[in-house]
Amino acid sequence: MCSPRDFRGNKYSHRVWCYLGKVEYLTTEGRKQVSYWSAKVIDEKTFTANAEVDEIKWVAVTKVRELLSMETDKEILDKFMKIKFDTKPLILLRHAKAITRDEWQGDDDDRPLDTLGENQSKRLLPMYQVYNLSQIHTSDAIRCYNTVQPIARGLNLKLEVTAKLSESTYRKDKDKAFDYAKELLKSEINAMICSHNPILPKMLNKLTKKSDVDADEEKLSPADGWVIHRNGKEIIQIDRLDAPLV
């Protein structure tokens, strides 16, 4: 278990699984907050000591507790030991901030991202590349396509563009987007769906209806996402990732 920044900073290639929680503590520079995920190292590089880390040591889970002094760290360990590993992510991402409907005179599917949305889209790759995505599916609306294009380019993936995930199709047939997502959920594919706010909350509710995991009741803001972690047919956990700070 580790923060993704620590993995990257110490040059470990890794794949992220379930979110474990946050730890806060005081330093000489003020309050510090660290978020933890379970993860798997894919490619271990030679480590060189630096200003933040003197040594990296792999420790068996059964022996970690005796090395921890903070209760909050022990709580993170407890959650780590309870969850299932090797989950497959299905990510539901709302498009980044777009020009408002009042500001746009053309077809709504052609409504582009505004300046904030363009900046958000450029910062999504570091957040989502750790999920080892192999497919990205997007609504054919320009604002969705342009949101995930930088991710696809960074991961060298071809975008799967479909009208089935668009608002215009949803208004005519509300089942098409859900059926599309359901097939991806049943697959063993690490995938992302980029769509719209009227669609994604209902999609999440339907996908998790028969699971033991509660769906998030709060709607997504632009560039927010949900990560559905699944192991076989079982949904293990749903993580919410807020939009990148710009």
Segments from the language model and where they lie:
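Active-site-adjacent alpha-helix immediately C-terminal to a catalytic or transition-state-stabilizing loop
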Residues: 176-236
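Generic structural signal for residues in well-ordered beta-strands
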Residues: 16-17, 56, 77, 159
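Active-site-proximal alpha-helix that buttresses catalytic centers in soluble enzyme cores
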Residues: 86-173, 201, 212-224
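The catalytic Nudix box helix
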Residues: 1-19, 60
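NUDIX/MutT-family hydrolases
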Residues: 36-40, 47-82
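Active-site-adjacent beta-strand/loop module that shapes the phosphate/pyrophosphate-binding cleft
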Residues: 23-46
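Short, solvent-exposed aromatic-acidic interface loops
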Residues: 239-246
